[in-house]
Amino acid sequence: MEDGKPVWAPHPTDGFQMGNIVDIGPDSLTIEPLNQKGKTFLALINQVFPAEEDSKKDVEDNCSLMYLNEATLLHNVKVRYSKDRIYTYVANILIAVNPYFDIPKIYSSDTIKSYQGKSLGTMPPHVFAIADKAFRDMKVLKMSQSIIVSGESGAGKTENTKFVLRYLTESYGTGQDIDDRIVEANPLLEAFGNAKTVRNNNSSRFGKFVEIHFNEKSSVVGGFVSHYLLEKSRICVQGKEERNYHIFYRLCAGASEDIREKLHLSSPDNFRYLNRGCTRFFANKETDKQILQNRKSPEYVKAGSLKDPLLDDHGDFIRMCTAMKKIGLDDEEKLDLFRVVAGVLHLGNIDFEEAGSTSGGCNLKNKSAPSLEYCAELLGLDQDDLRVSLTTRVMLTTAGGTKGTVIKVPLKVEQANNARDALAKTVYSHLFDHVVNRVNQCFPFETSSYFIGVLDIAGFEYFEHNSFEQFCINYCNEKLQQFFNERILKEEQELYQKEGLGVNEVHYVDNQDCIDLIEVKLVGILDILDEENRLPQPSDQHFTSVVHQKHKDHFRLTIPRKSKLAVHRNLRDDEGFIIRHFAGAVCYETTQFVEKNNDALHMSLESLICESRDKFIRALFESSTNNNKDTKQKAGKLSFISVGNKFKTQLNLLLDKLRSTGASFIRCIKPNLKMTSHHFEGAQILSQLQCSGMVSVLDLMQGGFPSRASFHELYNMYKKYMPEKLARLDPRLFCKALFKALGLNEVDYKFGLTKVFFRPGKFAEFDQIMKSDPDHLAELVKRVNLWLVCSRWKKVQWCSLSVIKLKNKIKYRAEACIKMQKTIRMWLCKRRHKPRIDGLVKVGTLKKRLDKFNEVVSALKDGKPEVNRQIKNLEISIDALMAKIKSTMMTREQIQKEYDALVKSSEDLLSALQKKKQQEEEAERLRRIQEEMEKERKRREEDEERRRKEEEERRMKLEMEAKRKQEEEERKKREDDEKRIQAEVEAQLARQREEESQQQAVLAQECRDRELALRIAQNESELISDEAQGDMALRRGPAVQATKAAAGTKKHDLSKWKYAELRDTINTSCDIELLAACREEFHRRLKVYHAWKSKNKKRNTETEQRAPKSVTDYDFAPFLNNSPQQNPAAQLPARQQEIDMKRQQRFFRIPFIRPADQYKDPQNKKKGWWYAHFDGPWIARQMELHPDKPPILLVAGKDDMEMCELNLEETGLTRKRGAEILPRQFEEIWERCGGIQYLQSAIESRQARPTYATAMLQNLLK
């Protein structure tokens, strides 16, 4: 099928695999993989896509593919990835695949120079091209820009962000120290904010929005970094294969001995905050030798160093110190940072044990004394005060509204541990804030015209165990995905509709309900969490129960027991919840949600740290203390500062900033879970492409216009360079002249109501027009002026040609007048002399008759001399009369009188001669009369037969018209009956459509949930549960399930029959009911297949027409979307009709204009005809007759794929006036076009299906 062309079909690990269609099922296609001949599998028809003809070809912009679908998108990315081409476009969106190794020269300074000022598409896809586009858009549009770098953890967001910043500073910096500072700030931020996770060795555990500010000359003048949601829980605990923040390990590995002794550092395994995770350093062979043995943990000694081409703890420590120096940190401030980091490590080593006294509480273990001493020393605290603050909590009693006694409440071991960890998180969090503020101080700016912001924030995260950090990160990604949907999909389509471009609508998943679930006031999860924090005794269990109670029937929220992973099903309902995010379902364990949502310390700990002897420590907490003065509660109580709502506020401010700027998108893709090079896991990459919206963008860009400019903006940009005569032009007319002057192809752009739009891949042309360089604008104005001059000169030429044509027309008319005068004069002359001329003609005719006299005389036997004398005298009289007419003016009456006398003489003479031969002539005359009578009799019989046939045809046509009118009346009667119940039916259908739409959304979401669960299971070496595995089987839509249910009540269940089996049964079966059922199922599958072909046709090609549009104009969507129309029960009348009507033969003819000729010939001179012979409800023979083309003959069986697949009722032919013709009219055309020979050859090759036509031909041949 499909002429052996390959298609892409789903594959569980590769995403898609190439194969051939070998059979058509009820709702699926049977595929034979190209690399596994003989093996087949089923694939849902809407998950099969046509493949490119050259499977090894790759394109830089996926919009250039012949077939635009998710399979070709994935394959193109894969082919380019195998060639180390990690960047690909989808229109103006960049897809970046993480290579996990250094590609030579791809980010060199020469490469940077090669992209400067180049339009998107003129150079190979690159992150530099997006950065340059953002800069040029900022410069031309006078509008700040944003670059949103998104993707999963480990997809390469941080690296691509650094490349964008480096490109902007190197290309458009002022050459001063500030350019280097902006670039050098990254190593410092990464050291304090990045860490190794199971999915990424250099994962950013915070979000940042880096703004590069430019002056009016578009030169870099400074920058600013905003940061969001540092993962504070990582400071105290990490996973087994994960590490704490890089700074801890780099300080242990790279610090000098002097610093090491001052900070009392040792190997990572000696610190509680490091030894519960991975304690190995990142190092290569050279730096491994430079790390002293006493700094290596036993795990490092046993397993060796961690390997990553971008990470090296010892070398990165040196680079970090260099970066600190470049951004202006002196040695003292550098040591302050290290001192706080070391203080946090020693704080974590403080252990507690239960006190032996009856008062309860706890004490420090003896072995923790050194750690307490080191921590107090490094943080500038008193040892005793630190001990007391960690083991007790101060409470202040109240009496009658006045302050009472200060009471110290001893803490239990668990409470002390929590207090210690809270202090460590707070200290490190404030240190990180200080680092970011210090970075911002190193590149200040006084004034800024515009900025380019680069957003790098943690990607969508899904682990086996997910907590509050993952919840906030995924909430952020939901908001960013919504911004992407709004900017790229929603706003684009609204603009296309507003401008009247006629672009087809693209549907996408709206995640607003998920965002509302999290952030809506009062009942949102964040507000419920804040409310829980305000309770006297908050608990995670109570919070979780309230969430489930408030959102009991919410589609996006469910209980852990419904997870696809077995490990989550062990959770109780009050221990977690599942949120169905845009990328898939994630199970959150709510333990510590309440604690992590509070960013405040107990008053005793906060007072302790704020009163530190160390001025650097005090400075870290001063700003926080000032901000929270008004929010402090009574001593001893834990004041509440909501982390969730603080992040929500920051996020909304960020999105407001993004919405106020132009946006460019970089979608980073993680090629595999093992983080190895040249390994492409298609299924999980496909999931990333789908979740990032690339498939929807691809659908939109089939007819989209990613670049646009307002007529007035263009006009105003060029106005000051225009001469006065051009300035008078209308803006729209000027734009048209500009495009004509540049020689742009009209296919590449389209004019809207107020803007001009450019197709994907035409960014170079757009940039050429929008380039605001004065010399360039002046040059374009000259070209417009030149084009206008040339255009007007052509108009002058045309006018000259028109004048010449008018002159020739005048000359032609003068000659015509002369000809008319000549003709009139001739006519007047003829009218004057016509009697004499007519007389001469008649007399001349009479003279010619004398030859007949001579013939008669020659046959006479007697009296010849006398007769000859009489004839001679008659001839003399005739000559005399002719001479008289010529010489004298005689009237018509005179001529007639003398002519009559001569005629009488000649008749008398002739009658005398004829009497002698009367007998012979009489016999001859009788014979001729007899022949004439016989001929007349035959002619009358033929006329009678013709009239009889015409009468019969008129009678048949009247019967056909009467039948058509009767059918029309019956149809109208049925419609009237339907209208009476239309309100109920429409309401029911609306409910069904809504339910089915929701069901489709649920199925799509469950599919994403399964894919995400599978990826977690692969990563965590955990199998998906049996129920989840069962769900991975081929899923059927509700309509297909209804079809199967209906099949159980029918006599013949054909749902499992193959396409070939249906065809063979139709050709051989004698069971009328089975034959009717097979015909119906056969044509239903043809409808589904042709609908699939129409949806997946080649780009910029017309849909293949098997019949005129008026016949095939039915809705394709129900067949692709598994709508209830697929239910065979709904088609039962057609089957019953075939059984009841005993295969009535009907013939039709309607006009047929091919799509390619539709607009080329307005007068329909190339109109063809479409003939159809229906054997019962199904078509048996089909003809197409087109001018200048050989006729196309098709017969059922042999040509099913090219014939009309609709039944007679669905075509509407019976309701078309004048469409039905007589069998004789069809058969005449069929025979004349060679149909008999074509049908005979099909019968002999056993390809023709048994029909009325085949039976008649076989009888004729016998």
From Swiss-Prot:
Keyword annotations: Actin-binding, ATP-binding, Calmodulin-binding, Cell membrane, Cell projection, Coated pit, Coiled coil, Cytoplasm, Cytoplasmic vesicle, Deafness, Disease variant, Endocytosis, Golgi apparatus, Hearing, Membrane, Motor protein, Myosin, Nucleotide-binding, Nucleus, Phosphoprotein, Protein transport, Transport
Domain Myosin N-terminal SH3-like: residue ranges: 2-53
Positions of the UniProt region annotated as Three-helix bundle: 835-916
Modified residue annotations for Phosphothreonine: T405
Domain IQ: 814-834
Domain of life: Eukaryota
Region (Interaction with TAX1BP1 and CALCOCO2/NDP52): 1034-1253
Coiled-coil stretches noted in the UniProt entry, renumbered to this chain: 864-984
Tissues of expression: Within the cochlea, expressed specifically within the sensory hair cells (at protein level). Expressed in the inner and outer plexiform layer of the retina (at protein level). Widely expressed. Expressed in the brain, kidney, liver, and testis.
Region (Interaction with TOM1): 1125-1253
Modified residue annotations for Phosphoserine: S267, S604, S1025, S1123
GO CC annotation: axon; brush border; clathrin-coated pit; clathrin-coated vesicle; cochlear hair cell ribbon synapse; cytoplasm; cytosol; filopodium
Single Gene Ontology BP annotation: synapse assembly
Positions of the UniProt region annotated as Actin-binding: 651-673, 665-672
Region (Interaction with OPTN): 1084-1086
Membrane association type: Peripheral membrane protein
PROSITE patterns attached to this UniProt entry: MYOSIN_MOTOR, SH3_LIKE
Location in the cell: Golgi apparatus, trans-Golgi network membrane; Golgi apparatus; Nucleus; Cytoplasm, Perinuclear region
Keyword Oxidoreductase: no
Observed effect of gene inactivation: Mice display hearing loss, hyperactivity and circling behavior, suggesting vestibular defects. Higher steady state levels of LC3-II, indicating defciciency in autophagy.
Record note on domains: Divided into three regions: a N-terminal motor (head) domain, followed by a neck domain consisting of a calmodulin-binding linker domain and a single IQ motif, and a C-terminal tail region with a three-helix bundle region, a SAH domain and a unique globular domain required for interaction with other proteins such as cargo-binding.
PANTHER family given in the database record: MYOSIN (PTHR13140), UNCONVENTIONAL MYOSIN-VI (PTHR13140:SF745)
Quaternary structure annotation from Swiss-Prot or TrEMBL: Homodimer; dimerization seems to implicate the unfolding of the three-helix bundle region creating an additional calmodulin binding site, and cargo binding. Able to function as a monomer under specific conditions in vitro. Forms a complex with CFTR and DAB2 in the apical membrane of epithelial cells. Component of the DISP/DOCK7-induced septin displacement complex, at least composed of DOCK7, LRCH3 and MYO6.
Record's function text: Myosins are actin-based motor molecules with ATPase activity. Unconventional myosins serve in intracellular movements. Myosin 6 is a reverse-direction motor protein that moves towards the minus-end of actin filaments. Has slow rate of actin-activated ADP release due to weak ATP binding. Functions in a variety of intracellular processes such as vesicular membrane trafficking and cell migration. Required for the structural integrity of the Golgi apparatus via the p53-dependent pro-survival pathway.
Name of the featured protein: Unconventional myosin-VI
Organism: Mus musculus
Gene it is expressed from: Myo6
